[in-house]
Amino acid sequence: MKLNNNGLENKNAWEAAGYALPQYDRETVAARTKQNPFWIHFGAGNIFRAFQANVVQDLLNKGDLDRGLVVAEGYDYEIIEKMNHPHDDYSILVTLKANGTVEKTVVGSVMESLALDSEDDAQFSRLKEIFSADSLQMATFTITEKGYNLYGSDGSFMPAVAADMAAGPQKPASYIGKVASLLYARFLAGEKPIAMVSMDNCSHNGDKLAAAITAFAEGWVKNGLADEAFEAYVKTSGKVSFPWTMIDKITPRPDASIEEILKKDGVEELDPVVTSKNTYVAPFVNAEECQYLVIEDNFPNGRPALEKGGLIFTTRETVDKVEKMKVCTCLNPLHTALAVYGCLLGYNLISEEMKNPSLKKLVEVIGYKEGLPVVINPGILDPKEFIDTVLNVRIPNPFMPDTPQRIATDTSQKLAIRFGETIKAYAAAPSLNVADLKLIPLVFAGWLRYLMGVDDNGNAFTPSPDPMLAEASSYVADVKLGEAFDAKKTLAPILSNAKIWGVDLCALGMDTLVCDYFTELTAGTGAVAATLAKYTA
């Protein structure tokens, strides 16, 4: 059983092994898509294959769509060359259900895959052709939050971006430069309308994409390298829109135990590929069943009825409320709390942590008691039900190979949003008192303890990558387990850093509690477990 056109001709073998197959004539759909593309997606990674591609497959199966997707990869061209093309753009989606069953689907909704490579004339010309098509309604993106960043740490354009600004839209090298070049092709083809839709997991994602594209339009026009009407085109929402979205589906990297299941079924050539850019890709993707995609309904060239596939279309204000609900209260803070303490207590699976009564109570209190009183209710999703699903279905799912180490990545960049917003809301509400927050400060103290790089048994571990790791770790570098130290003096410089926490913890008076907790957490080996048990009892 090979995952390609030839291998899938043997439908009976696949179906007998329990795989759901595409229920449409792929050749016909591919021909229609090539002629009249309606949706191109940038970022051929796991979330796209597990979510957007599968939604389109469902709609093709039901006859609600007659065309499929085009996907372009601009960060790592080897994904297209080594994964998409050998498998004729098929992939296997393994849905990991909380009850222990797995659902296996061969997803065939991607009809064409291209490298977003301006040095490859054939592929870049084809992308320009797609972008010039009247039929194209939307370009969507999962390129990670940093994919939209054009600036270096000194605030000036990164070298590739600066070079593109000076050279114009012909052969840009930077990711967004290449996308802006394609949009310029659409402009030149008659200022055709399009929705440019970021589906990355960051708040106000549409604004991030808009700012990046607009910077190129302004730069090229200013330098006399593009028609001056291009800038107005990009800035006119009736022509080019940048809707906000909220996406939520946990898609860990392809797991070896899932690979074994597929091998036993008789699927061949499943070996994952690690590209020269260190991207880890496999012909299959594993993901949780739960998924949410809420989209601001602003599509100047129309859109397909994706609500039939479970996507929610609404106003920008509602997208913002859903995003805040998830990121500031109902999911992300709980994930970070488990990530920090999971690493300290030696866990390798987030799901296993929910069997620890102290950790379970920690996230229940942070979610229901500390977070819910200030949650923003978006109306289209109920915050309490959302937390119920997170704590009872999603996080405890034993078949989700998600790790605290993965989630602990970049924690310094996440604390301000995931906890700082709740603290600000408490500080602003006359009926609430910041002093009533007891376990959010325990997470802060836990992160400072984590920065020591020593687990609760006294063994060294390597903290996950984080741009502030060296700086933040330096504040606790002299703290040793079981040795006396002045917590307030040691931690004051970092606790007053509002960039990290979203607020100045010293000014709010929360520093005392964080310091007290930190002193207890560093009392010796076993102190982390003991402190958690004490404050969650």
PLM region spans:
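Substrate/ligand-engaging "lid" and interaction regions
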Residues: M1-F42, N46-A537
